[in-house]
């Protein structure tokens, strides 16, 4: 028997000795199931029930971080001011700064390649100074902390700490995998868009050419697949594979739209989900699944990521019209110059139907670009897009507020940080 299974059985034994009778035996079985899932194995015992407390979702598929009352009998009360946004906020990025540095170093080692040119291309956006804000890894690390359960004060806390550290490493792996998939999509997008800047520096295709950029993106995806397979969780593998499929689907939707589709807000939002929100939402859900949470809690994590991603892209589309090339780290008016119609222009078209004809003519002629911008300036397109972004931000915040009750300060701090990130997304200027 491996040490992993021995450890899992030890946790189950702890549950069995915490009380007598059939209830203790069933609880031990649930703990064994959770520990086994954490360590990459999936035995088939039935899932435990989950509970509803007021409007909060409470429950887990088995305790990974175990309280003295074995979690399923615990009902933690969130302090009334626990998630108050009026409290002094800590910088969300600073909360996980040490882990982000660790992840950055691991990512640089993970993308090393035997062929020097491929290695140089693959590590281009992982080099110090070019790695960007690391927005997605930050969100995922904070989500992992926001979903954790407190360790007990028992004498067996050392065993539980081993499990906790093991889980944290696996959740860090999700952050690494997500960032590799994201960077791969950027490399491919820059080739498709013939972009010359990214993150304030020259794009890889501009420096090394399209062929090497495409190969570097493929290489990153292959490394992400290897890391994903190593987790040994088929549900998580399926989620992340779906996110990659959505990236391809969204990009295809963008480059092959009909006239009717270009005018459709529903089509735009579906494409935006595929291109931007699917990766972060499914990654948030993967973090919850690895921790052994119920489907309800995992869906709250997903909903947070989905609405955060949509809000992020809506503001990004606003900034394409209102920002500068220097502030955005890429060219402004990029979308419209490529004939891509986004929310601000869609709202302007609703307000000024004559704009449809301008859009249908395309934007190869600079005069059409200027005419479309004139209509946009007269409309409420920018304002209505910001309002829609706020709606999605509010939904993301509600998802965090509906997470299982906890009185753990680290958990509450992380949840406040996720709410803070949401507010930053819709108030950013770059």
From Swiss-Prot:
GO cellular component, one term: mitochondrion
Annotated transmembrane regions: none
Annotated positions binding Mg(2+) 2: 189, 193
Gene3D superfamilies noted in UniProt: Farnesyl Diphosphate Synthase
Catalytic activity: 7 isopentenyl diphosphate + (2E)-geranyl diphosphate = all-trans-nonaprenyl diphosphate + 7 diphosphate
Compartment(s): Mitochondrion
Keyword Nucleotide-binding: no
Pathway membership, UniProt: Cofactor biosynthesis; ubiquinone biosynthesis
Annotated binding of Mg(2+) 1, by residue: 189, 193
Binding positions for an all-trans-polyprenyl diphosphate per the UniProt entry: 198, 275-276, 313, 330
Cofactor(s) of this protein: Mg(2+)
GO biological process: isoprenoid biosynthetic process; plastoquinone biosynthetic process; ubiquinone biosynthetic process
EC number: 2.5.1.84
UniProt-recorded name of the protein: Solanesyl-diphosphate synthase 1, mitochondrial
Gene this protein is translated from: SPS1
């Amino acid at each position: 028997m491996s040490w992993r299974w021995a450890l899992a059985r030890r946790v189950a034994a702890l549950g069995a000795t915490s009380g007598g009778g059939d209830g203790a035996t069933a609880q031990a079985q649930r703990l064994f199931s959770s520990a086994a899932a954490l360590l990459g194995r999936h035995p088939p015992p039935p899932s435990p029930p989950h509970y509803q407390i007021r409007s909060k979702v409470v429950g887990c598929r088995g305790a990974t971080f175990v309280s003295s009352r074995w979690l399923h009998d615990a009902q933690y009360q969130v302090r009334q001011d626990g998630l108050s946004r009026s409290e002094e906020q800590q910088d969300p990025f600073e909360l996980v700064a040490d882990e982000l540095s660790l992840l950055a170093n691991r990512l640089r080692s993970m993308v090393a390649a035997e062929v020097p040119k491929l290695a140089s291309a693959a590590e281009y956006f992982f080099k110090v100074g070019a790695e960007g804000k690391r927005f997605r890894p930050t969100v995922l690390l904070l989500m992992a902390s926001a979903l954790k359960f407190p360790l007990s004060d028992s004498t067996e806390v050392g065993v539980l700490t081993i499990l906790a550290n093991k889980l944290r490493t696996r959740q860090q792996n999700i952050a690494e995998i997500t960032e590799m998939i994201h960077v791969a999509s950027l490399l491919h997008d820059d080739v498709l868009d013939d972009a010359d800047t990214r993150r304030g520096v020259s794009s890889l295709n501009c420096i090394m050419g399209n062929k090497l950029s495409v190969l570097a993106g493929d290489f990153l995806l292959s490394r992400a697949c290897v890391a994903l397979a190593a987790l040994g969780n088929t549900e998580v593998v399926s989620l992340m594979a779906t996110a990659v499929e959505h990236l391809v689907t969204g990009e295809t939707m963008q480059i092959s739209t009909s006239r009717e589709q270009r005018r459709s807000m529903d089509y735009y939002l579906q494409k935006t989900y595929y291109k931007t929100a699917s990766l972060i939402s499914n990654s948030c859900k993967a973090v919850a699944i690895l921790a052994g949470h119920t489907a309800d809690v995992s869906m709250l994590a997903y909903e947070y990521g989905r609405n955060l991603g949509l809000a992020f892209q809506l503001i990004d589309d606003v900034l394409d019209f209102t920002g500068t090339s220097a502030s955005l780290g890429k060219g402004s008016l990029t979308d419209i110059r490529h004939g891509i119609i986004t929310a601000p222009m869609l709202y302007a078209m609703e307000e000024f139907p004559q704009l449809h004809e301008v859009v249908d003519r395309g934007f190869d002629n600079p005069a059409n670009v200027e005419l479309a911008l004139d209509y946009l300036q007269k409309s409420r397109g920018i304002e209505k897009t910001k309002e829609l972004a706020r709606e999605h931000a509010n939904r993301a915040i509600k998802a965090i507020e509906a997470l299982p009750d906890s009185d753990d300060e680290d958990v509450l701090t992380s949840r406040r940080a996720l709410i803070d990130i949401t507010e930053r997304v819709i108030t950013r200027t770059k």
